[in-house]
């Protein structure tokens, strides 16, 4: 009999379950599906929604930070350009001041040179006059001594000596100036 039962059981298709098993399986599936749908699925959806909101919030925050960073970069570039313009302006002013200072110093040097040259000419003229006066006296004394030796008399009258010597030297100077 066991053999007959085994043979009868073998004839049944193993892919088609028996009705009571099928009903129990469907009932168990419906219970599990209901529990998962009512309890677990809302929690999963809630976590997924929070995650999506966090990601979107992070993206929005990143966009806001990007816009802010771009704004700061533009401000930095504007400040840098302004600083460059200011540096160029200061450099130009310094060059202009330097050129003005050089011009003033050259003018001052020229003025001092002219003063030194004028003082030198005045000193030379004073020295020439002093030398001419000393030379007149020495020439006059020598001429008087020589004339006295030639004539054999003493020519000690100073007033007359001075007049004769001055007339003679003035005549020499006039001849020298006429030949120039």
From Swiss-Prot:
Keyword Transcription tagged: no
Nucleus recorded as keyword: no
Superkingdom field: Bacteria
Keywords: ATP synthesis, Cell membrane, CF(0), Hydrogen ion transport, Ion transport, Membrane, Transmembrane, Transmembrane helix, Transport
Subunit structure: F-type ATPases have 2 components, F(1) - the catalytic core - and F(0) - the membrane proton channel. F(1) has five subunits: alpha(3), beta(3), gamma(1), delta(1), epsilon(1). F(0) has three main subunits: a(1), b(2) and c(10-14). The alpha and beta chains form an alternating ring which encloses part of the gamma chain. F(1) is attached to F(0) by a central stalk formed by the gamma and epsilon chains, while a peripheral stalk is formed by the delta and b chains.
NCBIfam families, per the entry: ATP_synt_b, PRK05759.1-3
Name by which UniProt lists this protein: ATP synthase subunit b
């Amino acid at each position: 009999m066991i053999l007959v039962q085994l043979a009868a059981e073998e004839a049944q298709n193993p892919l088609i379950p028996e009705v009571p098993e099928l009903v129990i399986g469907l009932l168990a599936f419906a219970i599990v599906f209901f529990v998962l749908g009512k309890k677990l699925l809302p929690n999963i959806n809630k976590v997924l929604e929070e995650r999506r909101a966090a990601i979107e919030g992070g993206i929005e925050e990143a966009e806001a930070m990007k816009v802010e960073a771009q704004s700061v970069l533009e401000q930095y570039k504007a400040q840098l350009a302004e600083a460059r313009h200011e540096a160029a302006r200061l450099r130009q002013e310094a060059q202009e001041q330097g050129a003005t200072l050089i011009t003033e110093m050259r003018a001052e040097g020229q003025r001092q040179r002219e003063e030194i040259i004028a003082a030198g000419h005045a000193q030379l003229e004073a020295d020439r006059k002093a030398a001419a006066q000393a030379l007149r006296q020495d020439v006059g004394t020598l001429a008087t001594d020589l004339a006295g030796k030639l004539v054999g008399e003493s020519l000690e009258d100073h007033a007359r000596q001075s007049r004769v010597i001055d007339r003679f030297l003035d005549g020499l100077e006039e001849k020298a100036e006429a030949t120039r």
